[in-house]
Design a protein with these regions (language model features):
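Claisen-condensing/thiolase-fold acyl-transfer catalytic domains that form or cleave C-C bonds
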Residues: 1-101, 112-113
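Long, low-complexity, intrinsically disordered segments
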Residues: 105-115
Length: 115
């Protein structure tokens, strides 16, 4: 439900940074979020490479944002979790396409990217 509400299925996903503390979590989350087989998951190494307490979820968001800012991807999913049995989840879709304001043009020098 969180992935659907965040808009995961609203367009192609280039990369997904998933909070997967165990290898089987990737298969579960990939399936439940409906991520295509060609979506690159955890190119950073994810929490299996480093899982700092209380920051691992924010790192997932930062990893996707960084890839959008450097131009390697256009749209990505970041997932964070906490609590027992993964019952507390956050899914964020970050998009590199610049949004237009109601006047039809962007008025900010800040990079777009959150949803």
């Amino acid at each position: 439900l969180a992935a659907e509400a965040a808009g995961v299925g609203d367009g192609p996903i280039d990369v997904a940074e998933l909070h997967t503390c165990f290898t089987h979590h990737e298969a579960i989350l990939r399936n439940e979020m409906g991520l295509a087989d060609d979506v690159v998951v955890n190119p950073s190494g994810g929490p299996l490479a480093a899982n700092p307490m209380m920051a691992a979820g924010m790192i997932r968001i930062g990893e996707v944002a960084n890839r959008i800012f450097d131009g390697t991807v256009n749209r990505g999913v970041a997932h964070a979790t906490g609590g027992h049995l993964m019952q507390h989840n956050l899914v964020a879709v970050l998009d590199g396409e610049q949004s237009a304001t109601s006047e039809g043009s962007s008025t900010s020098d800040e990079p777009e990217g959150g949803r």
